[in-house]
Amino acid sequence: MAVKEIKYYAEAREKIMAGVDTLADAVKVTLGPRGRNVVLEKSWGPPTVTKDGVTVAKEIDLEDKFENMGAQMVKEVASKTSDVAGDGTTTATILAQAIYRAGSKLVSAGHNPMALKRGIELAVAAAVRELRNMSKPTKDQKEIAQVGTISANNDVAIGDIIAEAMNKVGKEGVITVEEAKSMETTLEVVEGMQFDRGYVSPYFVTDPERMEVVLEDPYILINEKKISNMKDLLPVLEQIAKMGAPLLIVAEDVEGEALATLVVNKLRGTLKVSAVKAPGFGDRRKAMLEDLAVLTGGKVVSEDIGVKLENVSLQDLGRAKTVRIDKDNTTIVDGAGARSAIEARVKQIRAQIDETTSDYDREKLQERLAKIVGGVAVVRVGAATETEMKEKKARVEDALNATRAAVEEGIVPGGGVALLRCLPALEKLDLHGEDAFGVKIVMRALEEPVRQIANNAGHEGSVVVQQVKQGTGSHGFNADTEVYEDLSAAGVIDPTKVVRFALQNAASVASLLLTTEAMIAEKPKKQKPAPAMPGAGMEDMY
């Protein structure tokens, strides 16, 4: 069994502080519009350049096991804030460092860490209430663009693209970020329901120049199983031929005799028809076919519910205004489903999103929801080099997360001012003894983001903090223009959700560290020197 090494009391706290400082000092240089980049060495490929706090934090592992424990705990603050709010990781790290530093001094001076923890929790609860009172909902696309711009390190183009994407697909829509093949950053919006299945045969193409199938006002047959026997398909094809309308077949697969007959009839001009494979696999495929049926007002042909393909009538088929199919994707625009049925389906998917514990399932459910209600927007990020593209893509993802958070819970003044404006609420807390010291720890920590933003801009942090404290509302220091002004009017705003989670997560981990009095780690094993190589009887040879 491995031998353990134990550190107690002041020695343990010093080790934690060293680890916290090492990680936080590397992360906090990135804060604010004048924050610097951090270069990360990779085991393969070029180094990564980033200004994202959580990316820097995740790269840090320290040689000293006790210091590393402190660093890993603060890394957890950044990761948790990133997972839940999507941004604010640097702020969270700075707050955790400030709370632990002030608290550990008081513990060393003889204060009770459990009472300090209680005071910290009461102070954070009061600050969160004040943030919620301060918060305002996002009014328009301009404010969403401002949030995105601030989060993307003052890149106005990124802010505008994300605001446009949010405007096009709504807050329920899915916005994905991909690497472009050119130097331009562009936005592509897919309206309607799109899934990643193309035509089964290129013979179905109606636009040879673009290699696309375009069907106007088609009927849509949704079949759960494979279709290979023409006899099963014949009754519905006869009804469609009489109507003279186009037909889209969505099935697990269309093959053999059935596919050959469809292709021949399409080439002769007897039928306007196309076939695509059903999206997804297993239970997810069933759910997506049901979504498609609800959206188009049709029914899923499935033997599970006693419906056979040969018995299908036109009433069982879905309708849509337009269907576009290329070799990779199918897009269905303006499905004819009943509004009430679509709303019921949306409500059901939202309930599943709330209930699921799997991040993967939640992501897939949100994609399904977006396809029914909003649509999908793709931001294609372009840059001159691969290194720049990766850095820019990370900033776009940060900005996207921040704008979603802003739409969800509203916005507060940026630049660390919102946290400073919580100080009067903390001063009003009527606490005595050790609890009051816990509140003072948080009050000191709330100044730290403004101080660090000013330091990174080349100003004296303490002077800036005092100046901002004398103001009211959203009056603060704009580190980009280096002037004191109304930050909300200047477009320097933060999502309430991001600021709230940064404070709550920082206080949670820092107060846990404060109550630590012993640390246990595996003792490093002494490496035995390798034995000398034998001379093999050749010592005297030169």
Swiss-Prot record:
<dbReference type="InterPro" id="IPR018370">
    <property type="entry name" value="Chaperonin_Cpn60_CS"/>
</dbReference>
<feature type="binding site">
    <location>
        <position position="494"/>
    </location>
    <ligand>
        <name>ATP</name>
    </ligand>
</feature>
<keyword id="KW-0963">Cytoplasm</keyword>
<dbReference type="GO" id="GO:0005524">
    <property type="term" value="F:ATP binding"/>
</dbReference>
<dbReference type="InterPro" id="IPR001844">
    <property type="entry name" value="Cpn60/GroEL"/>
</dbReference>
<keyword id="KW-0143">Chaperone</keyword>
<dbReference type="InterPro" id="IPR027410">
    <property type="entry name" value="TCP-1-like_intermed_sf"/>
</dbReference>
<feature type="binding site">
    <location>
        <begin position="87"/>
        <end position="91"/>
    </location>
    <ligand>
        <name>ATP</name>
    </ligand>
</feature>
<dbReference type="GO" id="GO:0140662">
    <property type="term" value="F:ATP-dependent protein folding chaperone"/>
</dbReference>
<dbReference type="InterPro" id="IPR027413">
    <property type="entry name" value="GROEL-like_equatorial_sf"/>
</dbReference>
<dbReference type="GO" id="GO:0042026">
    <property type="term" value="P:protein refolding"/>
</dbReference>
<dbReference type="GO" id="GO:0051082">
    <property type="term" value="F:unfolded protein binding"/>
</dbReference>
<keyword id="KW-0413">Isomerase</keyword>
<dbReference type="InterPro" id="IPR002423">
    <property type="entry name" value="Cpn60/GroEL/TCP-1"/>
</dbReference>
<dbReference type="GO" id="GO:0016853">
    <property type="term" value="F:isomerase activity"/>
</dbReference>
<comment type="function">
    <text>Together with its co-chaperonin GroES, plays an essential role in assisting protein folding. The GroEL-GroES system forms a nano-cage that allows encapsulation of the non-native substrate proteins and provides a physical environment optimized to promote and accelerate protein folding.</text>
</comment>
<dbReference type="Pfam" id="PF00118">
    <property type="entry name" value="Cpn60_TCP1"/>
</dbReference>
<feature type="binding site">
    <location>
        <position position="51"/>
    </location>
    <ligand>
        <name>ATP</name>
    </ligand>
</feature>
<feature type="binding site">
    <location>
        <begin position="30"/>
        <end position="33"/>
    </location>
    <ligand>
        <name>ATP</name>
    </ligand>
</feature>
<dbReference type="InterPro" id="IPR027409">
    <property type="entry name" value="GroEL-like_apical_dom_sf"/>
</dbReference>
<keyword id="KW-0067">ATP-binding</keyword>
<protein>
    <recommendedName>
        <fullName>Chaperonin GroEL 2</fullName>
        <ecNumber>5.6.1.7</ecNumber>
    </recommendedName>
</protein>
<keyword id="KW-0547">Nucleotide-binding</keyword>
<dbReference type="GO" id="GO:0005737">
    <property type="term" value="C:cytoplasm"/>
</dbReference>
<comment type="similarity">
    <text>Belongs to the chaperonin (HSP60) family.</text>
</comment>
<feature type="binding site">
    <location>
        <position position="415"/>
    </location>
    <ligand>
        <name>ATP</name>
    </ligand>
</feature>
<comment type="subunit">
    <text>Forms a cylinder of 14 subunits composed of two heptameric rings stacked back-to-back. Interacts with the co-chaperonin GroES.</text>
</comment>
